[in-house]
Amino acid sequence: MVRYEHDGSVTIIADSYNGKRLNSPNDIVAHPDGSYWFTDPPYGGQLYEGAPDAAGGPSNAAGRLKPRLGQPPEIGNMKRELPNSVYRADPSGKLDLVIGQDQIPNPNGLAFSPDYKKLYVISTGRGPGDAHAGGNRDMHVFDVAGNN
């Protein structure tokens, strides 16, 4: 997750959790306390998006250029290190795991209630060609208190 500064420079806010590379931060929402909350699905872990998940990795079990359709990749051997999750980055960049894959399968899409006391998270369903079970397509609601 990066921030573009007014002078054109880029500041990395967060790129790992507990020493493991984030997948592809997505669906970011800002909180009035200065924190950013985001989902971290594997969508960027595909070669056509610039960061391949190697053959046999969680996002690319078949070892394809575009796992749902494509051809075998010729480059890259990095495998995804983290499950799909929801994180909170405080203003200093410290990350907290807020919601894990075990709580919501395939979290993707989130929003705060107008008073910021609730966090809504969508569980993405299985897509065509996906090898994994996918989420349940439900909207989940969580109370927000402090950093979780």
Task: Enumerate the language-model features and the residues they cover.
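Sequence-structural signature of mature extracellular/luminal beta-sheet repeat domains
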Residues: 1-148
